[in-house]
Amino acid sequence: MIAALFTTNLQLGAVGVFIFALLAFAFNKLTTWEYSIPKEVQWVDRRTQPFSYLRAKARALARSKENTLEAYFRFNKLGKAAALAVPFGRPLLLLPQTFVRWIVDQPESIISLDPIHDDFHVFVGGDLTGDHTVQELLRRELTLNLDKLISVINDEIVCALDDVLGNSPEWKSTSLADDLKTIVARTSNRVFVGKDLCRNKHYISTVKGLALVIMPETVLQDLIPQFLKGPLSRITKAFNNIYGMKKFSSLLLGVVRQRYIDVKDVLEGSGDKTRLPDDLLTWMVQKSIRKGESSANIDKLLVARIAMANLAAIETTTAAMTRSVLDLVTQGSEGGFLKAVQEETLAVVEGCNYEPSKKDVLKLVLTENAIKEALRLQVAFPGLMRQVVAPNGVTLENGLHVPCGTRLGVSAAGIHVDESIYEDPTTYNPGRFLVRDLDPRGDPSPMWKGNENYLAFSLGRRSCPGRWYVTDQLKLTLAHIFSKYEIRFEKAAETASALRKILPGAPQDRVMIRRRSVGKR
């Protein structure tokens, strides 16, 4: 009897294990998108083990840059494609650098950036799937108005630096990245929503925390079947509303509603156009009304769009600014780059009485080269990411067929440290851009203008839509920092995983900083 029961339980256990394995295989098949990668393509850091793709994806949290570089030097340099598991989103097919122009020139009906954006937009709130309003306004209206906004941007930089870094001639220890994030959030939101909100401490604290609520959820995009993404997005939106968007909305909603009324009055001829702020929110409302978008939920949609603008701007600009400052402070003395930037920035800002125009910003050539070099070395992820949208896929010139749904790109990190492209590629040398990539007049090419060898802002019509603004924002901020403050590197951040770095309380590089006696206003 006991033997029979034992045998029965053993059989049931075996059946259970089989069913579990079958379900696990089915779940893995439904969720990972690993099967969109052509079978003949080799993977980077994918080992022979159960759930090998998911485990490679987990390891990529700490190995993203290493894997991207390995794909480039082990495969792409030999003319071969390589497959990569990435922490956020579907696996990526990395193509050799020779495909850069091919990617840029393909029509949107073949490969597109939009599905990648949409996977992220679904978590923000509102109905932003397929909505490109933010990108369009940053690319057109912000760029066209940039010259006259320089004084506004400069005013906020000056005020934010005084508030955050202070005016004391005494040395103080501070977390550079967090301080710069506050400054970036304030200057960006001065252009997004105006002076009052950008100086509201509760609002700035909230926008700084948006990414901590929303970014981790993007990991789920590659871990659930397509048919579950709709229900999941509704759940995560509810979560976001409680922990992030609710507070953000409460601070912004009144401003949005009043701005909608003011813009509508102007368009109908009963309002004063001169009293409308030239900022992103005004342009959003104008575009919404002209498109005939329903006014029923327009306030929530506009709030979601402002949230998206903040998510796109704050994290990336903060990272670029932090790296630019730290590289100059820690490596810029050798070669005289730090001294050159200090002298240039002081001459420019004092020469215009600390109220620069666009012409003054253009004079910050050495400062721009320092930022450009920092971005060259900072890039850790693939570039030119696109998703194949042609229903039958696309066949590359080398005969490789890439199915619909596959995401592809190039290893920007690898290109940027290729010794056949850059001399001493891993050495910090802003001076390299004084002699390479020059324009027809022999002047250094502007940072926002990429090429096949420099992809910090991507390339082509789908480049970073705010790259002109970001270039000026970075240059102006560094001009004020290095003309007004002394900075010494104090302590490097403790080693941490990529996931740990995006969580609250993550270790940060620390610096000592004090106000200079010269350059005070």
From Swiss-Prot:
Pathway info: Mycotoxin biosynthesis
Domain of life: Eukaryota
EC number: 1.-.-.-
Any Pfam family: p450
PROSITE patterns: CYTOCHROME_P450 (PS00086)
Molecular-function GO terms, alphabetical: heme binding; iron ion binding; monooxygenase activity; oxidoreductase activity, acting on paired donors, with incorporation or reduction of molecular oxygen
Entry keywords, A to Z: Heme, Iron, Metal-binding, Monooxygenase, Oxidoreductase, Signal
Cofactor section: heme
Span of the signal peptide: 1-26
Phenotype of gene-disrupted mutants: Leads to the production of pneumocandin analogs with non-hydroxylated ornithine.
ATP-binding among keywords: no
GO BP annotations listed: secondary metabolic process
Entry-linked InterPro entries: Cyt_P450, Cyt_P450_CS, Cyt_P450_E_grp-IV, Cyt_P450_sf
Biotechnology: Pneumocandin B0 is the starting molecule for the first semisynthetic echinocandin antifungal drug, caspofungin acetate. Pneumocandin B0 is a minor fermentation product, and its industrial production was achieved by a combination of extensive mutation and medium optimization. Inactivation of three of gloP/GLP450-1, gloO/GLP450-2, and gloM/GLOXY1 generates 13 different pneumocandin analogs that lack one, two, three, or four hydroxyl groups on 4R,5R-dihydroxy-ornithine and 3S,4S-dihydroxy-homotyrosine of the parent hexapeptide.
Residues that bind heme: C464
Function: Cytochrome P450 monooxygenase; part of the gene cluster that mediates the biosynthesis of pneumocandins, lipohexapeptides of the echinocandin family that prevent fungal cell wall formation by non-competitive inhibition of beta-1,3-glucan synthase. The 10,12-dimethylmyristoyl side chain is synthesized by the reducing polyketide synthase gloL/GLPKS4. The thioesterase gloN/GLHYD exclusively interacts with gloL/GLPKS4 to maintain turnover of the polyketide side chain.
PANTHER family reported in the protein's UniProt record: CYTOCHROME P450, P450, PUTATIVE (EUROFUNG)-RELATED
Similarity remark: Belongs to the cytochrome P450 family.
Designated name of the protein: Cytochrome P450 monooxygenase gloO
Organism of provenance: Glarea lozoyensis (strain ATCC 20868 / MF5171)
